[in-house]
């Protein structure tokens, strides 16, 4: 077709939508020029051969490569683009590797043992956290002596401030890998443990959160695991199912507050914003739900902070330490959306995850901050069907299947989306497939969709980011971070000192007036 734009009708049957593809893409010069610019940038790329003052690890739980691509399309289309051509924030990182995610005892992994790998540098057994593979799942007596130490813990010992941010409960498998040692990832509180394990001296994960190490910032969900059984929840006081569940009668939040003179505990967005601006706050714990935080599509923006806002609040506090910081940020509910077989939930979580990466990049400098983005594992999630460019990622394939019914581009290999009534697969239309709660069809019936076993990507930017290359064991991630900051066992790293930045010039400091303005607006809206 000729003209300034090539118009494509994207969709057949009743699923018409209009996509606009630039006519210049028909000209080879467009692609040659684009490639030449990318090649020129690659030739100019120089490794930053200095010590990393700061370390940030962004973990997209379940963010396999197919999910990254689908997220790119969704985020691009949300911004009025066709989709696949629009880079994510993580796409702009200059270095890339693949990570092998298997556990010592499983070919397809879980989030506990993978956390041990990328956070502690040692591969482990399925459903265990912070322990070598000599430990056995659910056997309390195999814990002692098999503990492995996270890079975050080593950063704290080196004098850095440290923080954990997640959209799951803070006691969940991925964040727990920064501080806990347990043979069962589900031992969130003592109420979740068998009496025999408690008698043998094993500790629940919530107890380890406040006792194993001094964590400066803790933001996520998980209130009920911190309070005695029957303690009403501040957000849902009339709902007994949201009450505290601890059997030992301990108030772990109060115990944590008592340890630090400048500690604050918050449970909503307004309190978080206030605490993050208060220079007297040295430690900050924010628990915004009894369990996991709400999905982004269900989040109340006046009450619940987004992952991007939690990340910014953490950076504001941690960046005050002149010796630097370590921050772990997890987009944890990407994984949950996939397990439920609801791609809309998973991908909108992933878009917010990328927004948090983008904001962190604005608030830090790649000259002194090593930032890695990776996943713990993938999912049996795929999209295909020869869909036309610009069509909704949640839409239908342009042709019907052999049973003369439509099918969605996104499908799951297994999960709760399996529906076969009297030997007949249900039909689907564009309106159904675009619904936020639509469960994509699956090939095998399971109550919960499973992880995938393929390699995942590792994106890197900052000092020593060039070490992220090739195909590596997942445990390599932790070693790159430890080496970059000259932490154990790489204290003799012989790297040049980190780049110097002044408080006045620091991007986080520059953002304070904007945040103060946000608080004023919040106060005004709350006024009678």
UniProtKB/Swiss-Prot annotation:
SMART domains: alkPPc (SM00098)
Molecular-function GO terms, alphabetical: alkaline phosphatase activity; magnesium ion binding; protease binding; zinc ion binding
Any one cellular-component term (Gene Ontology): plasma membrane
Positions of the pro-segment in this chain: 504-528
Cystine crosslinks: 140-202, 486-493
Catalysis: reaction(s): a phosphate monoester + H2O = an alcohol + phosphate
Cofactor note: Binds 1 Mg(2+) ion. Binds 2 Zn(2+) ions.
Keywords: Calcium, Cell membrane, Disulfide bond, Glycoprotein, GPI-anchor, Hydrolase, Lipoprotein, Magnesium, Membrane, Metal-binding, Signal, Zinc
Gene3D superfamilies referenced in this protein's UniProt entry, alphabetically: Alkaline Phosphatase, subunit A
BP terms from Gene Ontology: dephosphorylation
Functional description taken from the UniProt entry: Alkaline phosphatase that can hydrolyze various phosphate compounds.
Other known facts: In most mammals there are four different isozymes: placental (ALPP), germ cell (ALPG), intestinal (ALPI) and tissue non-specific (liver/bone/kidney) (ALPL/TNAP).
The protein, known as: Intestinal-type alkaline phosphatase
Organism per entry: Homo sapiens (Human)
Source organism phylogeny: Eukaryota, Metazoa, Chordata, Craniata, Vertebrata
């Amino acid at each position: 077709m000729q003209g300034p734009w090539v118009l494509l009708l994207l969709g057949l049957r009743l699923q018409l939508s209009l996509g606009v593809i630039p006519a210049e893409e028909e000209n080879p010069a467009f692609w040659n020029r684009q490639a030449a610019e990318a090649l020129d940038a690659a030739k100019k790329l120089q490794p930053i051969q200095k010590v990393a003052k700061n370390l940030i690890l962004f973990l997209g739980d379940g963010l396999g490569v197919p999910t990254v691509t689908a997220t790119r399309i969704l985020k691009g289309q949300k911004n009025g683009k066709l989709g696949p051509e629009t880079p994510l924030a993580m796409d702009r990182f200059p270095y890339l590797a693949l990570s092998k995610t298997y556990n010592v005892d499983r070919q397809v992994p879980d989030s506990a043992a993978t956390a041990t790998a990328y956070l502690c540098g040692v591969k482990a057994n399925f459903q265990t956290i912070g322990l070598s593979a000599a430990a056995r799942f659910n056997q309390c007596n195999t814990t002692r002596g098999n503990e492995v130490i996270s890079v975050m813990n080593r950063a704290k010992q080196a004098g850095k401030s440290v923080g954990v941010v997640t959209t799951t409960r803070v006691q969940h498998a991925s964040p727990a890998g920064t501080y806990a040692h347990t043979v069962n990832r589900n031992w969130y509180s003592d109420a979740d443990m068998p009496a025999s394990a408690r008698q043998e001296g094993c500790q629940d994960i919530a107890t380890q959160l406040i006792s194993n190490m001094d964590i400066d910032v803790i933001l996520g969900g998980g209130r009920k695991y911190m309070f005695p059984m029957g303690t009403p929840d501040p957000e849902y006081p009339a709902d007994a199912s949201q009450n505290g569940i601890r059997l030992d009668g301990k108030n772990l939040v109060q115990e944590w507050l008592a340890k630090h003179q400048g500690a604050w505990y918050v449970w909503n967005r307004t309190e978080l914003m206030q605490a993050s601006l208060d220079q007297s706050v040295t430690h900050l714990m924010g628990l915004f739900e009894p369990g996991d935080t709400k999905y982004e599509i269900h989040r109340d923006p006046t009450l619940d902070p987004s992952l991007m806002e939690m990340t910014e609040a953490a950076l504001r506090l941690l960046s005050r330490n002149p010796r630097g910081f370590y921050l772990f940020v997890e987009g944890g509910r990407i994984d949950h959306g996939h397990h439920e077989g609801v791609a809309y939930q998973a991908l909108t979580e992933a878009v917010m995850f990328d927004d948090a990466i983008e904001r962190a990049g604005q608030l830090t400098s790649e000259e002194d901050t090593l930032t890695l983005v990776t996943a713990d594992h993938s999912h049996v999630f795929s999209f295909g069907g020869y869909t036309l460019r610009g069509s909704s990622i949640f839409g239908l394939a342009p042709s019907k299947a052999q049973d003369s019914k439509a099918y969605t581009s996104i499908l799951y290999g297994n999960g709760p989306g399996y529906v076969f009534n009297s030997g007949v697969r249900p039909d689907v239309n564009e309106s159904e497939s675009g619904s936020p709660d639509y469960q994509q069809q699956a090939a095998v019936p399971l109550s919960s969709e499973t992880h995938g076993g393929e390699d995942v990507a590792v994106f890197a930017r900052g000092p020593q980011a060039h070490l992220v290359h090739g195909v590596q064991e997942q445990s390599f991630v932790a070693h790159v971070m430890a080496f970059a900051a000259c932490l154990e066992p790489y204290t003799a790293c012989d790297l040049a000192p980190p780049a110097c930045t002044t408080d006045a010039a620091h991007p986080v400091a520059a953002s304070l007036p904007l945040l103060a303005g946000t608080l004023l607006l919040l106060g005004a809206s709350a006024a009678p």
